C-alpha cells in the first residue's frame, strides 16, 4: 500500500511537470505562428533558387542514404546568424525534454533562446555530391526540428546567475561587421533581399510568368477548366525567312543508258559486222552527245552515215532479239537437254555422211 501511495504522489508530480511543459510548448508554437516562423498551410515561394552546376550534373542519379544511430535536429532561428569565425556559437541545454534551450555567446554576455521540438510535414535533407557525377550521398535526414521562437538577453553568469530577462545592449543593434553574405541557401529568397536593402530596387532581367490562381482554374473534381486558362502567343523577335521550295530530282533528264547484257552469239555478230565503229564507242554514251556529233559533221559525213545504215540494221535486230528473249536459269536439266541435242546433232551428221 505504501508503494502504491508513493507511486500516486510521484505520478501527480510528473503530471504537473508534463502540464507545465505542454503549456510552454503551446505558447512557443503559437508565438512561432505569429512571427511567421511556421505556417499551417504550405507556403508558396515567390522566387525560386536556380539549380547550381552540380545539381544539373547529378540530375537523374541515385541518392544513397546511410543508417544513422544518432538523432539529428534542425534548428530554426527567429533571425539570421552571421558568425565572424568558425567556432562554437553556444551551448545546447535541456535536450532530453520537449523544450530545449540554446545559449549564444557574445562578447557582452549571453542570449537565451527558448525552443520546442516539432514534427513538420516537410522533410529536410543535406546532400553531398560526388565529383564524377555517379551518385549522391544523403548525409543528414531530418524528421523533426527545433523552433526557437523567443529570445532573452541574460548577460554574463556573474552578473545574472538567476538568468533573469534584461534589456538588449545598444551595441548589438548596430552592425559592425558588414562582410557577411546571405545570398546562398535560403537567404537567396526575395523576402531576405527586401529586408537587407529596402531602399535599392532591383531590375529583374527575366520576365516572370503570370500568376494564376489554381482555385479559379480548377473545377470541383480537380480538373482544369478550358474557359479560364489563357495562353499568350509567343513573341517572334526576328521575322521569319521565306525559303522557296526547290524540287531536287535524282534522275538525269535527257540521258538514256543501255545496261542490257547481250548473249555470246549477238556479241560475236556485232564484232564481225562493226569492227571499226562499234569498238571505238563507249558502252555508256548519251544520245545528246551522238546528236551533237552528227550535226557537227559535213554533208559528206551525212551521206557516209546514210550508206552505213543497211549494214547496221541486222546488228540492231539481233540486239532487239536478245532483249526480247527470256532469261533461262542454268540448271542441271537444261544442261542435260543441251548435251542430248548436241549428241543428236552429231549422230545425224554421221548418218548423213555414211549415206
UniProtKB/Swiss-Prot annotation:
Expressed inproliferating and endoreduplicating cells. GO terms for cellular component: nucleolus. It comes from the Eukaryota. Residues 14-23, 281-296, 309-326 have a biased composition (Basic and acidic residues). Residues 230-246, 260-274, 344-355 have a biased composition (Low complexity). GO terms for molecular function: DNA binding. Keywords: DNA-binding, Nucleus. InterPro entries: RHL1 (IPR038859). Disruption phenotype: Plants have no hairs on primary roots and have an extreme dwarf and seedling lethal phenotype. GO terms for biological process: DNA endoreduplication; root hair initiation. It is found in: Nucleus. Residues 1-26, 181-215, 229-355 are annotated as: Disordered. Component of the DNA topoisomerase VI complex involved in chromatin organization and progression of endoreduplication cycles. Binds to DNA. Required for endoreduplication beyond 8C. Interacts with BIN4 and TOP6A, but not with TOP6B. This is DNA-binding protein RHL1. It comes from Arabidopsis thaliana (Mouse-ear cress). The gene is RHL1.
Amino acid at each position: 500500500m505504501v508503494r502504491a501511495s508513493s507511486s500516486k504522489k510521484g505520478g501527480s508530480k510528473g503530471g504537473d511537470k508534463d502540464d507545465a511543459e505542454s503549456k510552454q510548448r503551446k505558447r512557443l508554437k503559437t508565438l512561432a505562428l505569429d512571427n511567421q516562423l511556421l505556417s499551417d498551410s504550405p507556403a508558396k515561394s515567390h522566387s525560386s533558387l536556380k539549380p547550381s552546376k552540380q545539381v544539373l550534373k547529378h540530375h537523374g542519379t541515385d541518392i544513397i542514404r546511410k543508417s544513422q544511430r544518432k538523432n539529428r535536429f534542425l534548428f530554426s532561428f527567429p533571425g539570421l546568424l552571421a558568425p565572424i569565425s568558425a567556432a562554437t556559437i553556444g551551448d545546447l541545454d535541456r535536450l532530453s525534454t520537449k523544450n530545449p534551450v540554446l545559449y549564444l555567446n557574445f562578447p557582452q554576455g549571453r542570449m537565451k533562446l527558448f525552443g520546442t521540438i516539432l514534427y513538420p510535414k516537410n522533410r529536410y535533407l543535406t546532400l553531398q555530391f560526388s565529383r564524377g557525377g555517379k551518385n549522391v550521398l544523403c548525409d543528414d535526414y531530418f524528421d523533426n526540428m527545433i523552433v526557437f521562437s523567443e529570445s532573452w538577453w541574460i548577460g554574463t553568469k556573474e552578473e545574472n546567475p538567476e538568468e533573469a530577462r534584461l534589456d538588449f545592449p545598444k551595441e548589438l543593434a548596430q552592425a559592425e561587421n558588414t562582410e557577411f553574405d546571405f545570398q546562398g541557401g535560403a537567404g537567396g529568397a526575395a523576402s531576405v533581399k527586401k529586408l537587407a536593402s529596402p531602399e535599392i530596387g532591383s531590375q529583374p532581367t527575366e520576365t516572370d510568368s503570370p500568376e494564376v490562381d489554381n482555385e479559379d482554374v480548377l473545377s470541383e473534381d480537380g480538373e482544369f477548366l478550358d474557359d479560364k486558362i489563357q495562353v499568350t502567343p509567343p513573341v517572334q523577335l526576328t521575322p521569319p525567312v521565306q525559303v522557296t521550295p526547290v524540287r531536287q530530282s535524282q534522275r538525269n533528264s535527257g540521258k538514256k543508258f543501255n545496261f542490257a547484257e547481250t548473249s555470246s552469239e549477238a556479241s560475236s555478230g556485232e564484232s564481225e559486222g562493226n569492227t571499226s565503229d562499234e569498238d571505238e564507242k563507249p558502252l555508256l554514251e548519251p544520245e545528246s552527245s551522238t546528236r551533237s556529233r552528227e550535226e557537227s559533221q559535213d554533208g559528206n559525213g551525212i551521206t557516209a552515215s546514210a550508206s552505213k545504215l543497211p549494214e547496221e540494221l541486222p546488228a540492231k535486230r539481233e540486239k532487239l532479239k536478245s532483249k526480247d528473249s527470256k532469261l533461262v536459269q542454268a540448271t542441271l536439266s537444261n544442261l542435260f537437254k543441251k548435251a542430248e541435242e548436241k549428241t543428236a546433232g552429231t549422230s545425224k551428221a554421221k548418218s548423213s555422211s555414211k549415206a
